[in-house]
Amino acid sequence: MHGNGGQPAAGGSESALSREGQPGPSGAAQGQVISNERSPRRYSTRTINGVQATNKFTAVGNPSLQRDPDWYRWNYNHSIAVWLRECSRSHAKICNCGQFRKHWFQECAGLEDRSTQASLEEAILRPLRVQGKRAKRKLDYHYSQPTPNRKKVYKTVRWQDELADREADFTPSEEDGGTTSSDFDEDINFDIGGDSGIVDELLGRPFTTPAPVRIV
């Protein structure tokens, strides 16, 4: 601190703050001197204990890792999440204990072999098949959309064609007596007539003696 008239304080020497600058993020720390020279590429040079150093290779864009810790924390958490996901997928292919975290402890570090299970191949190939079907649906949608040189492609109803093919290929067997269902439909008359008691009961009319159903 300076005394009256701008003279140095008692002791004949300047304080540490006036000699090295304000402490903190904007100034130098103990034993550091910051040069005022700024590079066109936005990195600075420091002299630490007589050794010249620069943050040219440590800066990440304008806000470096030292000035913006949230950037480092976000990337760290993202990397950990990706690693845990890969551990879970790899563990599911070789063990069926349920949780891969159990193998981090010595008392339950053994592996349970899945090679004897019949569903091993299905468990490994199912993600690939599901992703393939999902990708095919997306491609089918884009293929059906109209383009300047092509009209919209509509889906083809295949179940009607398959039903017609089955009826055309049907041949009566010997157990059926060589007859089809159409032969029986011609001999049955389902007309119950207007004077039937069933019709009166459905309409809420007084119940009368129902007429017999005629079967020709």
UniProtKB/Swiss-Prot annotation:
**Which reaction equations make up its catalytic activity?**
O-phospho-L-tyrosyl-[protein] + H2O = L-tyrosyl-[protein] + phosphate; O-phospho-L-seryl-[protein] + H2O = L-seryl-[protein] + phosphate; O-phospho-L-threonyl-[protein] + H2O = L-threonyl-[protein] + phosphate
Give me the stretches of Acidic residues compositional bias: 172-187
Which parts of the sequence are annotated with region: Disordered? 1-50, 165-187
Q: What is its EC number?
A: 3.1.3.16, 3.1.3.48
The superkingdom of the source organism is Viruses
Stimuli inducing this protein: VP1 and VP2 are detected 12 hours post infection, while VP3 only after 24 hours.
Q: What protein is this chain from? A: Dual specificity protein phosphatase VP2
Encoding gene (name) = VP2
